[in-house]
Regions:
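Short glycine-/aliphatic-rich beta-strand segments at the starts of folded cytosolic domains
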Residues: 19-23, 62-72
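Short amphipathic alpha-helices in soluble, non-transmembrane regions
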Residues: 31-42, 77-90, 147-149
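Short, conserved, surface-exposed binding loops centered on an aromatic residue
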Residues: 56-60, 121-124
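Helix N-cap motif at beta-to-alpha junctions
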Residues: 26-31, 73-76, 138
């Protein structure tokens, strides 16, 4: 039977430039036919970029590349975020509570984010701080950028910060683009 599966659904409130979808259809159709039919029924704001045979298995997704923007009320507040967040990233550990499962029960698990972060850089742009993040994303380990941002904001002593988070790419364990 036909199906549609998103191997790594996007969190609510995030935007993306790279969602991947696995579909199965009945009958013979070309990639162009599939693309045309899907474009006709795509929700507003979603754009189909391409349809092609998969090169990799969804299980090969290991990381995601994100850009996050934290929006402050004043440049001084943005500048004040950097030392605390930088110290947290340079520390020995960054322990957070992450929702998880134990069997069928939902539990809170304590994890150290620092060894899981593949890449993190920060830069101030006037009233904003731009972060470039590569975080685990996949079947084995999945770290939401919101979880990391929550921890950095707490360590920097800021709250009620506006956020924009965009997923740019899904990546393999070798940090190659998932295809």
């Amino acid at each position: 039977p036909p199906y549609m599966l998103s191997p790594l659904p996007l969190s609510l409130g995030f935007s993306s430039q790279c969602e991947s979808m696995d579909i199965r259809i009945e009958g013979e159709m070309t990639d162009a036919d599939i693309a045309g039919r899907m474009r006709d029924v795509m929700p507003e704001g979603l754009r189909l970029l391409s349809v092609r045979e998969p090169v990799m298995q969804p299980s090969e997704i290991a990381f995601a590349d994100y850009r996050a923007q934290l929006c402050f009320d004043a440049p001084e507040l943005a500048a004040g975020f950097l030392p605390g967040a930088g110290a947290a990233l340079a520390g020995e550990s960054l322990i957070v509570q992450k929702p998880g499962k134990s069997g069928r029960k939902k539990v809170m698990k304590e994890i150290d984010l620092l060894p899981l972060i593949a890449s993190c850089s920060m830069e101030q742009k006037e009233r904003a701080v731009l972060l470039k993040l590569i975080l685990p994303a996949g079947n084995q380990t999945n770290i939401s950028p919101a979880l990391l941002l929550d921890a950095l904001e707490e360590k920097a002593g800021v709250q009620d910060v506006g956020r924009e988070i965009t997923r740019l790419e899904l990546l393999t364990k070798d940090l190659q683009m998932f295809e």
